[in-house]
């Protein structure tokens, strides 16, 4: 019975947020977001991937970008990327088969550190 009440409470929480949460959101809604952080990450990752030979869709407002898989099986490409400690998500999970998705809402240093690994990954698929 207690478990059922807990589930009902969580479900109702989605319908009617707790008062404290409503007050916090009301204050945050007026706050400005500094987008320069995300813009720098987007530009660095986008340009870095293009220099490696990857074809990318430049996002206009998202915190992730889609990269064209260099092979037909984007899931196999995601697996290959893991060998370089790169985590990609198959685009088919988001209705974009043939692409992989990568988020850039991470520390700038993480993106800078990942670019050499993307270069190594690209060597498997592109002739220079």
Show the residue positions of the predicted features.
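PLP-dependent class I/II
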Residues: 1-128
């Amino acid at each position: 019975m207690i478990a059922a009440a807990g589930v009902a409470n969580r479900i109702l929480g989605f319908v009617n947020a707790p008062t404290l949460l409503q007050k916090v959101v009301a204050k945050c809604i007026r706050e400005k977001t500094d987008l320069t952080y995300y813009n720098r990450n987007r530009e660095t990752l986008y340009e870095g991937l293009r220099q490696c030979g990857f074809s990318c869709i430049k996002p206009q407002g998202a915190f992730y970008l889609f990269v064209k898989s260099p092979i037909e099986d984007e899931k196999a490409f995601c697996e290959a990327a893991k060998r370089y400690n790169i985590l990609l998500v198959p685009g088919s999970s988001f209705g974009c088969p043939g692409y992989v998705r990568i988020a850039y809402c991470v520390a700038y240093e993480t993106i800078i550190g990942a670019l050499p690994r993307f270069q190594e990954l690209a060597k498997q698929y592109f002739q220079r």
